[in-house]
Amino acid sequence: MRLKKLPIRRKMPMELAYIEKLFREEVGLDIKEHKDKAEQISETVVEIYEELLRKGIENANYNGRDYVSYYDLPITEDLERYMNRFIQDRGEEVLKAFVDYLAKLEEELLKAEEALPPLDEELHQKKADILGGIMLMFASVAKQINGDRKLYAESIPVTREVLRTMI
């Protein structure tokens, strides 16, 4: 089964405060006063997750399975490092609101996944870690591209493309 586009809603209900606090305290990047940037960032995170899931579906089909395993997803070493960082920082106050947001996002993804092959339990359990890792990776790459504390709108598409090549 090859999907052109996963049926996941693009506009995520992420408040600017979640991303703003995460970016400022984790990598020192300021996105204050720009709600549209938060929406672009959350859309990018979901797009990257969709790409991973799409490739995971292809790998599961290639291996003759009718379910998708966590190990079917092409998790790179870089993404795994950011996932581990997210897991370690999950208890910190800066990430609590973001983890709560990820729980809401997971509900949205589960609704969309009804049209997909079933996902194994480990993949369900690691979904928030994957999304959080992608978000931290986005923040880190954006900081390197911008070079200072402010996130510029024109750097978001560049960051998106860099992430696509890294993952």
Swiss-Prot record:
InterPro entries: DUF1931 (IPR015207), Histone-fold (IPR009072). It holds the Pfam family DUF1931. GO terms for molecular function: protein heterodimerization activity. To A.aeolicus aq_328. This is Uncharacterized protein aq_616. It comes from Aquifex aeolicus (strain VF5).
